[in-house]
Amino acid sequence: MYDWDEITGNSSNSIGYVNFVDEKHEFVSTHYIVNGIPVVKVSLSKSADDTLEWLYEYLYKLYKEPLYSSESEVQAQYGKLFTDIDKSETPQYIWRTDRSCIALIHWYDSDEDITKYYIKAEPIK
């Protein structure tokens, strides 16, 4: 979706992508810079009951098994691999490619009781 060198600032809008394979699940992405590091978030345009499972299967089809999947491993590695850390985020899985670290995130706002799942990616440090 992105080449890291192309992200030089914060996006002012989200970008939507039609999923021709599964029209029920359309993507939305946004990008921004944190301490000079580009960050991309990809989510489904409409949350569904199967969002976590669907995003996992999507990433699995692209990258196979996650590098980190046990809760303790994921938590420990997330802080080492990612620059943009939000206290409301709980990483579920982490994949690593030649150029990127990719996490499947559970985000929860306890004040509003809102849960979201999304993919977050950053270039390898």
Give short role names for the model-derived ranges.
Residues 1-125:
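A cross-family detector of function-defining hotspots
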